[in-house]
A protein has these predicted regions:
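Hot-dog-fold acyl-thioester-processing enzymes
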Residues: 1-82
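Short, surface-exposed secondary-structure edge patches
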Residues: 2-3, 50, 88-89, 235-236
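Feature captures hydrophobic
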Residues: 144-280
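Short alpha-helix capping/helix-loop boundary micro-motifs
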Residues: 1, 82-87, 230-231
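HotDog/MaoC-like acyl-thioester-processing domains
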Residues: 1-7, 91-150
Length: 280
C-alpha cells in the first residue's frame, strides 16, 4: 500500500504468535537486560508476577514484526519516525500474542511524494486482553493515486473548511449558534483548527485565531478515528468517560453542548465523503 491508499479508521489484524522460552533467552541476550525478573525462576516467584516475564520492549518488537509481516508497506516504507508505547500487563512464556491496528492519522509531506502514516497498536493475549498499546508513525511513499481525501484529518485547516461548509448548510447548527459570538477550537491529537463563529455564521477557519479559541474541544487521534467510523457515535457516553476534554471558558463550552453534538454528527457524515483538498 502507498500513502494515498490508507484511510483514517482502517483496521488490520496480525498474528497470533506464541511466546517461547527461546524468545525469552534470545531477547535477554540481544537486549542485555538480564535482570533476575527475566532470568531467575526463584527470584520471579517472590514477585507479584510469580514467574519470569519478558522484557517490556519485547512486546513493541513483536508488534513491529507482526505489522511488517502483513506486508502492507513492504514496497513503500521510507523510515520509522516516532513511537510511543505503554505496558499494561506482563508478557510471559506461553502467551499467544496478536496485533490489532487502527490507522489514526495521515499527514502529507510538504514536498509531496510521501507522507506520514500513524497507527494505533494494541498487542493482545489469547483472551483478547490488551497487554501493551501505543502509536507508531512511519514515512511512506506515495504512488500515483492522485489527491488524498482529507475528510478524516481532524484538526487540519482543510478538514475545518470542509466541516464549516457542511455546518453552514445545517439548519440545526445555525440555530444553535444564532446568538453566539466566539471561536470554537477543535483538536485531534496535536492538530487544532479554529472556527470563528458570529451569530449563526462561520466567518473564518484558521489554524489559530488572533485572540485564541473561546474554548477547545478535543481528543487523541485514536478516539476521533473510532468516533468517525463507528456505527454509532455514543457521544454522550464518550463525554462521560472522559474520552474528550475541553479547555478555555467552561461556561461557553456548556452553553454550546448542543452545537458540539451537531458538529460531531456532521463530522461523521463528512467522514463518509471524499473531500480531496491538500491537508494543511
Amino acid at each position: 500500500m502507498y500513502f494515498e491508499d490508507f484511510r483514517v479508521g482502517q483496521r488490520f489484524t496480525a498474528g497470533p504468535r506464541v511466546v517461547t522460552e527461546e524468545d525469552l533467552a534470545r531477547f535477554t541476550a540481544l537486549s542485555g537486560d538480564d535482570h533476575p525478573l527475566h532470568t531467575s525462576v526463584e527470584y520471579a516467584r517472590g514477585t507479584s508476577f510469580g514467574e519470569p516475564v519478558l522484557q517490556g520492549s519485547f512486546g513493541a518488537a513483536v508488534a513491529a514484526g507482526l505489522w511488517t509481516r502483513l506486508g502492507l508497506v513492504s514496497a513503500s516504507i521510507v523510515a520509522a519516525t516516532e513511537e510511543s508505547w505503554t505496558y499494561h500487563r506482563p508478557i510471559k512464556v506461553g502467551d499467544e500474542l496478536s496485533l490489532a491496528v487502527t490507522i489514526v492519522r495521515l499527514q502529507d509531506s510538504r514536498g509531496g511524494g510521501q507522507g506520514l502514516v500513524t497507527r494505533y497498536n494494541e498487542l493482545r493475549d489469547g483472551a483478547g486482553t490488551v497487554i501493551q498499546s501505543g502509536t507508531a508513525t512511519a514515512l511512506v511513499r506515495a504512488g500515483d493515486g492522485g489527491p488524498r481525501p482529507v475528510n478524516r484529518d481532524v484538526g487540519t485547516v482543510a478538514w475545518g473548511k470542509a466541516l464549516a461548509e457542511a455546518l453552514t448548510a445545517n439548519p440545526a447548527f445555525v440555530s444553535a449558534v444564532a446568538s453566539w459570538d466566539g471561536t470554537i477550537g477543535l483538536r485531534g491529537g496535536e492538530h487544532e483548527v479554529h472556527l470563528r463563529v458570529y451569530r449563526g455564521r462561520i466567518i473564518d477557519v484558521t489554524r489559530r485565531s488572533p485572540h485564541g479559541a473561546t474554548f477547545t474541544f478535543g481528543a487523541p487521534d485514536r478516539i476521533w478515528a473510532d468516533l468517525l467510523t463507528a456505527e454509532e457515535s455514543r457521544f454522550g457516553a464518550r463525554l462521560m468517560t472522559g474520552e474528550f476534554t475541553s479547555s478555555g471558558d467552561p461556561y461557553e463550552y456548556l452553553r454550546l453542548t448542543k452545537a458540539l453534538e451537531i458538529i460531531v454528527d456532521v463530522a461523521r457524515d463528512l467522514a463518509r465523503t471524499e473531500h480531496t483538498e491538500v491537508a494543511a
